[in-house]
Amino acid sequence: MIHPTGALVYEKETLYSHLDVIDNGNIRTLYLDGNIHSQMYKDKPEELVNTYTKYFHLGFLFNPNAKDVLFVGGGGFSGPKNFLSMYSDVRIDVVEIDPDVISAARDYFNLPVDNDGSRIMIYNDDARNFLSKTEKKYDLIILDAFSKNYVPFHLMTLEYFQLLDKKLTSDGVIISNIIGSMTGDRSNIVRAVYETISQVFPSVYVFTTEHNSGNLQNIMLAAMKSPTVEYSKDELRQLASNNDNNNHNSSTALDDLDYLEHLYEAELKTNDVPLLTDQFAPVEILINPVTNEPYNFENVPTKGSTGLSWIEDTNSIKLVLLTLIAAVWIFYTQKEWKRNQKKMSL
């Protein structure tokens, strides 16, 4: 079947989203509710297609001896597959809430079978529920469960980060992916998460994935459990050099990113954003400036081409339908109210 962005390989309405697997040349893409979630080279399924996923390796910059890794959010399992291919001594757990996403990854994205003898274990569960039950501690936890249009609020609150802190080893690291900007109201969600995570972890670094920090993009946060001095850019470069001398694969993975030039060193003001808690986490308001902005994901046609127009058209149709539903509801509510008023007057 021909799809606006390529050939439709598979689709399903899951309990959590509408899932599409689309082929466009050598790139296979997982869409959730019309938004790109993961991409894969069909001829090299372990390689990372999207730049932001390469920043997952920052965890090994700060903790080069990491062995036990947890991914929160599976999708197409790009990060876990890449880690398995690059780090022979790493053990990976992945927690993904949607069983149909896991099935699609196995069937269409070369996800290895997990069993007692494999280095990857997959858990179909809500992340907080899983973390509350497990007694395991991790050297590195990667948070990749957010999208441009949806952020599960309970995965970015103070209580959640406190739970993560308990599940980290003494040198543990958190790498979190957030879509936003470093300037304007599109930075609100980034700054609120930064403010919240900083209450728990003593050192938090911010990396942009584009040179223009004002663009809407993937913003990567790196948070350390152990109290450390704040590394400067030069000190981080030396840290990377030390890892390189020790033949650690993370240096190779990060080489082509020029990632140190993306270290955000300006002061990040948080006095106008809330501390996110289980009792108060207005994430829908915070991400509203982000959801209303077109987001140019890599390796897909950009806005204005035939590629993403179906997504924007779908959003417009949804808005029209919601408006019509609201109008009909108001009409019948008023009609029912008038009928009740007449009955009361008789």
Indicate where each model-derived feature is located.
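Soluble small-group transferase modules, centered on the S-adenosyl donor enzyme superfamily
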Residues: 1-39, 203-337
